[in-house]
Amino acid sequence: MAITVGINGFGRIGRLVLRIALSRKDIQIVAINDPFIAPEYASYMFKYDSTHGRYSGEVSHEGENIVIDGKKIRVYQERDPVNIPWGKDGVDYVIDSTGVFKELDSAQKHIDAGAKKVVITAPSSTAPMFVVGVNEDKYTPDLNIISNASCTTNCLAPLAKIINNKFGIEEGLMTTVHSITATQKTVDGPSHKDWRGGRTASGNIIPSSTGAAKAVGKVIPELAGKLTGMSLRVPTVDVSVVDLTVKLLKDATYDEIKAAVKEAAEGPLKGVVGYTEDQVVSSDFLTDNRSSIFDAEAGIWLSPRFVKLIAWYDNEYGYSTRVVDLLEYVASKN
């Protein structure tokens, strides 16, 4: 029996989540809410995508609905989630991809509006975080509001899990070289909390903070306090890369590290982790649905306990795929 789902926030992640969910027979998207996007505009934004290409099916709008491949999806424009009629539409699960309602108190509004469970597509300081392939098995049905963490944590955590399980991680530093996102500026503009973040996105490499590495400690508790990192925003439209430099607890050759990642990518983490020895660049991973693709040729071994590891990720599409995977997992446990 299909689960009924509503999407709050029809931005980059919300639209890609819809694309991916439409390919899953066990998911029925019945409603979308975005206060800034009317049905006609929603259909246009869903149909055309500058990064991932045009939607392959039929898209139109009819009254208060968008129509995708003949199926109507109701569009609401409520600013406050408590006013979205999830209950009336029979919505059991809400994916909140606004980046605004990311804490337990604000996401609770979806429950108050009639939904049963909420998956937040952003890291949260109060909602429990889950990363598919890392700790989703710790989910219990009493948890009504959960977070899918960030795209970078979804790339880093599976790699850290593999390395920590096999060799142990004493400590590490991460840099993510990250594509442009919607919060950045097309030209220099005001950004009071992050002055550098207000500079022209297309013409600069912009250092930024990220909690992605520290968040690994929330999904892998034994790594709490052992990882931290930063972000460098670069002028590419999509696909990012994690540079993880770690001090190991056990001696390892680079070949042993490669073998451990390859074994996981072909076994228990297949579909979540990838492995490549090709001479790849970022655009080779556009619309890749994996969380973390280990670049065996780009890493550096300095000594038996000190290595640099590189992993690619489509920060839009790979992450959105995991959102849907986590939703399905939660539904299977309820």
UniProtKB/Swiss-Prot annotation:
TM region positions: none
Segment forming the signal sequence: none
SUPFAM superfamilies given in the database record: Glyceraldehyde-3-phosphate dehydrogenase-like, C-terminal domain (SSF55347), NAD(P)-binding Rossmann-fold domains (SSF51735)
Record's keyword annotation contains Oxidoreductase: yes
Binding site for D-glyceraldehyde 3-phosphate: 150-152, 181, 210-211, 233
GO cellular component: cytosol; external encapsulating structure
One annotated GO molecular function: NADP binding
Keywords, comma-separated and alphabetical: Cytoplasm, Glycolysis, NAD, Oxidoreductase
Chain residues that bind NAD(+): 12-13, 34, 79, 315
Main location: cytoplasm
GO biological process: glucose metabolic process; glycolytic process
Reaction(s) this enzyme catalyzes, per UniProt: D-glyceraldehyde 3-phosphate + phosphate + NAD(+) = (2R)-3-phospho-glyceroyl phosphate + NADH + H(+)
EC number: 1.2.1.12
EC class (word): oxidoreductase
Biochemical pathway: Carbohydrate degradation; glycolysis; pyruvate from D-glyceraldehyde 3-phosphate: step 1/5
One Pfam family linked to the record: Gp_dh_C
Similarity section: Belongs to the glyceraldehyde-3-phosphate dehydrogenase family.
Family matches, as NCBIfam families: GAPDH-I
Name of this chain's protein: Glyceraldehyde-3-phosphate dehydrogenase
Originating species: Wickerhamomyces ciferrii (strain ATCC 14091 / BCRC 22168 / CBS 111 / JCM 3599 / NBRC 0793 / NRRL Y-1031 F-60-10) (Yeast)
Gene behind the chain: GPD
